[in-house]
Amino acid sequence: MSPVPSVTAVQVENVLFPPSVKPPGSTNDLFLGGAGVRGLEIQGKFVKFTAIGVYLESSAVPTLAVKWKGKTVEELADSVDFFRDVVTGPFEKFTKVTTILPLTGRQYSDKVSENCVAFWKSVGIYTDAEAKAIEKFNEVLKDETFPPGNSILFTHSPLGALTMSFSKDGSLPEVGNAVIENKLLTEAVLESIIGKHGVSPEAKKSLAARLSELFCKEAGDEKIEAEKVAPVAC
């Protein structure tokens, strides 16, 4: 396994996302890919509801760099395909959604379900299996309440399991509250945040900027290794 990239923490409002975490249900340390708020314009004022951090397994950097290194931050931020590759890539992801305003599980699950189903229908992949997965997703969240500072946690396995858990104090539990075995749901939850119609443009920009920097470093490290093997005259 690749070493975890050295990255900085990100402060979003009063929520600090650390540089790396070990998600519930995982044996891996993941690095902070990016973070940002989710909000809505209400009566001319931008109201912030949640702070969202997206973490990635270290293998994400070399995997994504093959196709995306050399692109500018703006090119990455504007590319639907780039974020689709992040969502569907063969590496683990972890999403931490921390409330800024109070939120009920029902409010959260209704919105996420709506976004997931809309995405599936738009690409023609909504089946009974996805309907059952959404039903379980809603069931896990329906009786939960999230005062400010509480978190909803998603560990996205590349094998297709979505581990759901909750945190009241900022700490991360070792195991999840529920595991839903459905690859499309595992991807769609993250797609709803950073995909084409993702709810956090700020998190998308943060991901693009931080991954672009890591791609540059990856390319630089490859060049240094190549020059060790075959020194290049200056």
Swiss-Prot record:
First-tier enzyme category under EC: isomerase
Residues at which substrate binds: 50, 115, 192
Keywords, comma-separated and alphabetical: Flavonoid biosynthesis, Isomerase
EC annotation from Swiss-Prot or TrEMBL: 5.5.1.6
Pfam family, any one: Chalcone
Catalytic reactions of this protein: a chalcone = a flavanone
SUPFAM superfamilies: Chalcone isomerase
Keyword Protein biosynthesis appears in the UniProt entry: no
Pathway linked to the protein: Secondary metabolite biosynthesis; flavonoid biosynthesis
UniProt key word Transit peptide: no
Molecular function per GO: chalcone isomerase activity
Site (Important for catalytic activity): 108
Gene Ontology BP terms: flavonoid biosynthetic process
Similarity-based family: Belongs to the chalcone isomerase family.
General remark: Part of the biosynthetic pathway for all classes of flavonoids, a large class of secondary plant metabolites, many of which are brightly colored.
Role, per record: Catalyzes the intramolecular cyclization of bicyclic chalcones into tricyclic (S)-flavanones. Responsible for the isomerization of 4,2',4',6'-tetrahydroxychalcone (also termed chalcone) into naringenin.
Name of the protein: Chalcone--flavanone isomerase 2
Originating species: Vitis vinifera (Grape)
Gene designation: CHI2
